């Protein structure tokens, strides 16, 4: 006699599951092998990053921000210095802007590589994981030569970067670009037309165009659903508008489309790096002068007066944030990374609100999982690309 179980089964996946990409817990309700409900449990890696910012100067806070998305630390550093720069009207030298752009794109490639390897391992293909570590090591060698650190670089500064590029670094980076492009083609030959891979990703976790916009998705999650939205084109920050490159996008909206977008972005990042390395200008790599509106409380100050402040390179609090508010965003590998900064005419920010892309993108996960098979959970979660350091903050 066949005994059937009518009651649904509740399974707790994580926070110590090897495919969880961090300390994420999913409380999954199963009806046989089908997912009936899913409740993500967050907060295991919450460290109060926004509150810490209120008692630190920007320079003192820089080492903390590399612990948000610890696989793409250049972007968290960029947003941390961009917010005070915009608030205080600090002009970044062109050479510093080009150096930042090169570092950001190298960090984007490293982040996408470390997404590709574990994503394929989750599906069951172990080989690409070892391939991507080989190329990622070369990027970390470039970071170490320029910043002194392989991870947690602490390289960006208000008004520029900490140090100039060392002698021979540009040639070494160009050599890496020439080496890396054929490797991306090799990944595609290994993966893209593999019938087992296609069965696991095609038509899985489909997000429509309107749905992606309504959920506030960003980055590859949004562009894989047919929306050509890239902040490097939209906001024209740094010097991206001076280079020739294309926004990678797909219309499928499934896990396969998100894979194709990230593969294409690695190619475009190499194109950006090659152009930037050949066009990088000379000149200073930092500007330590802040040009802000003079306070009306000062005597003899007119409406068009400017007050010049010196930005110290030491952690000592010499740079005051104006009493204004500003929202700054950059196109991180996982989506729109933003900071809403409120200054209070003091060395410390009054409010430092972080808009992490992984946290917003993760909200759609329960809707994607309902009705899918248990084995598809890892595929869909892996295609979102989350890092719990920035999700929990």
From Swiss-Prot:
Biological process annotations from GO: photosynthesis, light reaction
Bilayer disposition of the protein: Peripheral membrane protein
Subcellular location: Plastid, Chloroplast thylakoid membrane
Major location (coarse): plastid
Annotated GO MF terms: NAD binding; oxidoreductase activity, acting on NAD(P)H, quinone or similar compound as acceptor; quinone binding
InterPro entries recorded: NADH_Q_OxRdtase_suD, NADH_UbQ_OxRdtase_49kDa_CS, NDH1_su_D/H, NiFe-Hase_large
Keywords: Chloroplast, Membrane, NAD, NADP, Plastid, Plastoquinone, Quinone, Thylakoid, Translocase, Transport
Protein family: Belongs to the complex I 49 kDa subunit family.
Protein name (record): NAD(P)H-quinone oxidoreductase subunit H, chloroplastic
């Amino acid at each position: 006699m066949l005994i059937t179980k009518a009651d649904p089964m509740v399974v707790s996946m994580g926070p110590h599951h090897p495919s969880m990409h961090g300390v994420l817990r999913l409380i999954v309700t199963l009806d046989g092998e089908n997912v009936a409900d899913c409740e993500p449990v967050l907060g295991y890696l919450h460290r109060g990053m926004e509150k810490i910012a209120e008692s630190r100067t920007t320079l003192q806070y820089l080492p903390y921000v590399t612990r948000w998305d610890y696989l793409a630390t250049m972007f968290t550093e960029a947003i941390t210095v961009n917010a005070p720069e915009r608030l205080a009207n600090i002009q970044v030298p062109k050479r510093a802007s080009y150096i930042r752009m090169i570092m950001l794109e190298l960090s984007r490639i490293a982040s996408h590589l470390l997404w590709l390897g574990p994503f394929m391992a989750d599906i069951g293909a172990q080989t690409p994981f070892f391939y991507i570590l080989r190329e990622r090591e070369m990027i970390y060698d470039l970071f170490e030569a320029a910043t002194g650190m392989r991870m947690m670089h602490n390289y960006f500064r208000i008004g520029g970067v900490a140090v100039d590029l060392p002698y021979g670094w540009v040639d070494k980076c160009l050599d890496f670009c020439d080496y890396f492009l054929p490797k991306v083609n090799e990944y595609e030959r290994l993966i893209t037309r593999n019938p087992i891979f296609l069965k696991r990703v095609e038509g899985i976790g489909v997000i429509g165009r309107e749905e992606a916009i309504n959920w506030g998705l960003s980055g590859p999650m949004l562009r894989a659903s047919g929306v050509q939205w890239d902040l490097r084109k939209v906001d024209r920050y740094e010097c991206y508008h001076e280079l020739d490159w294309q926004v990678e996008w797909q219309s499928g909206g499934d896990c396969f489309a998100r894979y194709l977008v990230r593969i294409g972005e690695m190619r475009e990042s190499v194109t950006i790096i090659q152009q930037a390395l050949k066009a990088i200008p000379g000149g200073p790599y930092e500007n330590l002068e802040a040009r802000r509106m003079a306070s009306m409380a000062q005597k003899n100050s007119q409406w068009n007066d400017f007050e010049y402040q010196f930005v110290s390179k030491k952690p000592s609090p010499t740079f005051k944030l104006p009493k204004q508010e500003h929202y700054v965003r950059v196109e991180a590998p996982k989506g729109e990374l933003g900071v809403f900064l409120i200054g209070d005419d003091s060395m410390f920010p009054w409010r430092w609100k972080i808009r992490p892309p992984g946290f917003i993108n993760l909200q759609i996960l329960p809707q994607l999982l309902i009705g899918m098979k248990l084995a598809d959970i890892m595929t869909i979660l892996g295609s979102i690309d989350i890092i719990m350091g920035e999700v929990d903050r």
